[in-house]
Amino acid sequence: MLIIKLYIIILYINEQLFLSVFFFFKNIELQYMTFLGIQYVYKMNYSNIKSLDKYKTLTISVPKKWIYMVQLNRPEKLNALNDTMWREFKICFNQLATEPECRVIILSGAGKTFCAGIDLQDVMKFGQDLAKHEDIARKSKIVQLRIKEYQESFTAIEECPKPVIAAIHGACIGGGVDMISAADIRYCSLDAWFQIKEVAFGMAADVGTLQRFQKIIGSDSLVRELVYTARKFSAAEALQQGFVSRLLDNQESLLNSSLALAEEIANKSPVAVQGSKLSLIYSRDHSVQEGLDHIAMYNQSMLLSEDFVTAAVSQATKGDLPIFSNL
C-alpha cells in the first residue's frame, strides 16, 4: 500500500512539472482588463473570448482565469429588459454552459442600477401588435409564446451547469428579481433594494419569482407579503431573510468579493462543482430518495474521473492547489 501511495505521488509530481512547463509557454499572453477602475492582470490559457457571440445588451469579459462576467449593458435605460436582452440572455448562458474555459459566471449590471425590470416601451409596442389580432384565442396564443420565451431566458441561468453569482447594486425590480432568483449565489451592496412589482401593474409575476423566490427564503408569510403588496425591501432585509448571502459596503467591494468567491470556486474540480449544482437543483424539486438516487447515478461515473485522484493526492500531501483540466 505504501508503494502504491508513493507511486501516485511521483506520478502527481511529474504531472505537475509537465503542466507547469506547458502552461509557462502556453500562457505567455497577458491580458489586462479594467472594471470600475480596478485593473486585473491574468494569464490567458487557450480561451478565446472572441468565439462568443457579440451582444447588443450584454457585455462579456474575463476578469480572471475561468471566470466570465456577464454584465447587463443598457445603463441609459437602467438595464431594463427589452426584447433583445431577453433573447440574448438565453443565447449567452447556453453558450457559456458549453464553454470549457468558463467555470464560474458573475452576473452584474452597468451603471447605477442593476435592473429596472421589463422595458415598458417594449410592453406597449407588444400591446399595439397584439391589438391587430381580433380573435381571443389567437391573442392568447401569442401572449403564451411570449411568456414562455421570457421564462426560457432565465431558466437558461438555472440550467447552466456553471455556478452563477449575481452581484446586485442599486435597484433590482420585477424581472430583475426573476433573474437573480435563478442564480446560485447572490451578493449585494448596501444601496441595493428589491421589489417584486408585478401586482402593481395588474399582473402576476410569471418569469420565475413565484416559483423560485419562495424556495430561497425561509418565510412563506413574507414571500406572500412581498408578492401581494409589491413593497420594496432593502439589502439588509434581503440578507436577514437569506435572499442574499453577503452584504458589501459599495459596488467596488461587491465586485471584489464576488470575484474572490468566483476564484475560490473556479479552483475546485469542475466535475465536482457542476455535479453538485445539478444535484442541488434536481433535489430541490424531488424527494430525498430521488435525490440520493440521482447523485448515486452521477457519481458512479464521475468518481472515476482524474479529478478525484488529483484532489485526493493534494489533500493527502497538503501540497499546492490541485490543477484540474477543463470540462
Model-flagged regions — what are they?
Residues 1-60, 326-327:
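Eukaryotic N-terminal low-complexity, Ser/Thr- and Lys/Arg-rich leader segments
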Residues 77, 101, 109-153, 202:
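Glycine- (often His-adjacent) and acidic-residue-rich active-site loop
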Residues 185, 225, 229-231, 237, ...:
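Well-ordered beta-strand positions
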Residues 187-192, 244-293, 304, 323-326:
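C-terminal long alpha-helix characteristic of the crotonase
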